[in-house]
């Protein structure tokens, strides 16, 4: 069984994969992870391009588009690893990005999921809108992230470099203990 599997769900994202997958393959495989692309019934050239340009990437072929949650649920039935990262196809990763996540999870067996800080691809000094630095719920039930509240995105000045408990981790870069994911029944297919 692999230690870490990085799984990217794709639907007609040939150009996006061609742009962002090189960093994922390079820096994930360097840290011993296995990279998967779960194709959600694409009708573009995604699968042919992946086979031709990324031979080390493991392909999971789903016959039709099952959406985000069910697409991942079906794909992860075909993955055996201690940890799985659900990673959006438009994420560029950096060297050793998996190391602190795996080290944290190894040391905290009570934790089922975590996430890295996510910075904007276009403006690397700012947080990304999707997930930023961990999710919370305010006292009125409104979800927000460290680094992004409503439409305001903060500059990353190291203010969120500490590890803290979060209420939710973003699906854009969700690092999960696969056994816990399966025990919980996976993602809710209604979303």
Predicted regions, residues:
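Glycine-rich, basic loop-to-helix element that forms the pyrophosphate-binding segment
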Residues: 61-79, 89
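A conserved acidic beta->alpha catalytic loop
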Residues: 23, 39-48, 64
């Amino acid at each position: 069984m692999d230690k870490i599997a990085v799984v990217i769900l794709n639907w007609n994202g040939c150009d996006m994969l061609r742009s962002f997958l090189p960093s994922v393959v390079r820096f994930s495989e360097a840290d011993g992870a296995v990279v998967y692309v779960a194709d959600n019934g694409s009708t573009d050239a995604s699968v042919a391009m992946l086979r031709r340009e990324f031979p080390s990437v493991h392909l999971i072929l789903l016959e039709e588009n099952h959406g985000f949650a069910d697409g991942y649920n079906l794909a992860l039935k075909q993955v055996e690893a201690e940890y799985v990262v659900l990673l959006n196809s438009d994420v560029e990763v950096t060297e050793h990005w998996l190391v602190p996540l795996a080290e944290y999870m190894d040391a905290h067996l009570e934790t089922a999921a975590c996430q890295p800080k996510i910075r904007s691809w276009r403006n690397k000094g700012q947080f990304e809108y999707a997930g930023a630095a961990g999710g919370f719920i305010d006292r009125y039930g409104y979800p927000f992230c460290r680094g992004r509240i409503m439409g305001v995105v903060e500059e990353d000045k190291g203010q969120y470099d500490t590890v803290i408990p979060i209420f939710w981790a973003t699906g854009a870069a969700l690092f999960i203990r696969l056994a816990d994911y399966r025990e919980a029944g996976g993602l809710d297919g209604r979303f």
